[in-house]
From Swiss-Prot:
Subunit structure: Homotetramer.
Protein name: Lectin
Source species taxonomy: Eukaryota, Viridiplantae, Streptophyta, Embryophyta, Tracheophyta
This protein's UniProt keywords: Calcium, Lectin, Mannose-binding
Role noted for this protein: Metalloglycoprotein, containing Ca, Mg, Mn, and Zn and the carbohydrates galactose, glucosamine, mannose, and fucose. It agglutinates erythrocytes of blood group A1.
Organism, as annotated: Macrotyloma axillare (Perennial horse gram)
Calcium is among the record's keywords: yes
Length: 32
């Protein structure tokens, strides 16, 4: 995905930090 480093503090209020491909891992998107 082109969405990049997501860090979900709250599934209702996600924090988005754009910066590279990411994969979903336990409520967090992490760069591979």
């Amino acid at each position: 995905a082109n969405i990049q480093s997501f860090s979900f503090k709250n599934f209702n209020s996600p924090s988005f930090i754009l910066q590279g491909d990411a994969t979903v891992s336990s409520g967090k998107l992490q760069l591979p």
